[in-house]
Structure formats: structure tokens, C-alpha cells
Amino acid sequence: MTEPENRCRLVLIAPDIADADEQAKIVADALKGGDVASVIVPQYGLDDGAFQKHAEKLVPLIQDAGAAALIAGDSRVAGRAKADGLHLSGNAEVLSEAIDKHAPKLIVGGGNAADRHTALEIGEVRPDYIFFGKLDGDIKPEAHPKNLALGEWWASMIEIPCIVMGGTDPASALAVAETGVEFVALRLAVFGEPARAPSVIAEINALLDEKAPRFED
């Protein structure tokens, strides 16, 4: 991730847009709105060649904005697109294998652990971060209560940074921040109305600046 602030920061999940140029423009515009730690780029339903094309357009503009570009699932695409990292939704074994192959050259994290036991197993392989929720799990205005609870428990005990998936309401970012986790991931909350994405990011950062708890040194 890029340099940490002393509060929870925003992670974006790139929107599901089939046209690579349109997707790149929307993400680039959004990143003008303010601080974003990283952008995760899912494959959605794209074939490997199309995903490669999308990634090659997105990665440089994400990096130019000062954020880390993380490719979901495909290490070959991550390497060819010169991404900063790889986001995986698998179990500890999947993450361990990827860490052995790609760290520290690439950031490697993810998990989607649904319970504490699975989360601790993932923690034992020392990913760069753990993710609670699904990349397309923003189906309600608020973050899923289970993910909030897991994030709060994790952040209180374990030093590995944590990302929790937020909801479709931009204000859900604050509820995530109040658990003490380092990062909140948003997708539809930012990109539901693409033209508003920059102003939504500015509003979320202002909200977190004003109300999010501060981390102790």
C-alpha cells in the first residue's frame, strides 16, 4: 500500500465496465477526488486477453495517482501489467503459495475469511493484508455486520493490515473505520454514479478526516 495515514484509508474496487477505455477514464477521474491507498482490479467476466488489456490501461493511471494497483486473481496479468500486487480470495494455502512465488516483489493479500479460525490460518502465512468480505459483496447500504465484527476483532489483536468491504452507502466507510481497521473497500458507493465518483471520494475523505478514530503510534 502507499504511505499510511493515521486513520482508516480508502481502497477502491474498480467498477465492472466492459469497455477498457471507459473503465480507465472513470477510475482516473475518481482518483482525482482525493486520497486512495490502492485500487483492486477484478476480472469480472472478462476473458484473459481482455482482462490483460483492462489491467494495462488501469495500472499506470492508478500508480500515477499515488495508489497501489492490485490485480485480482491472475498473477500473470499482474506481472505483465507491472501491477504492485496480487489480490486473492482463496484460503491460506492459496495465499501461502502466492507469497512464496511473488513476495516481496508483489504485494500479496486477500482471503475473504468467513470466520476467526480461517482468518487466523491466513494470518499464519503472513500476507501483506487480509480482506474481510467479497469484492462484489456491497449488496446493501451498510457493510456486512459479520465483516465489521471480524475486522474489529482482527484489528484489536493482529498487526497484519486489514481491509473490510463497505456497503453501497459512502457513509458506510465511517462504520468500517470505527472498527479500527486500516482500510475500507468501496465499489458501488463510489462508482454507482460514475460522474459523481470524484466528489464522493472527496466527501468520504472529509468524513474520515473529521470522524474516523486515529491510530496510536
List each language-model region with its residue ranges:
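Conserved N-terminal beta1-alpha1 strand-loop-helix module at the mouth
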Residues: M1-H87, A92, K101-V108, A113-D128, ...
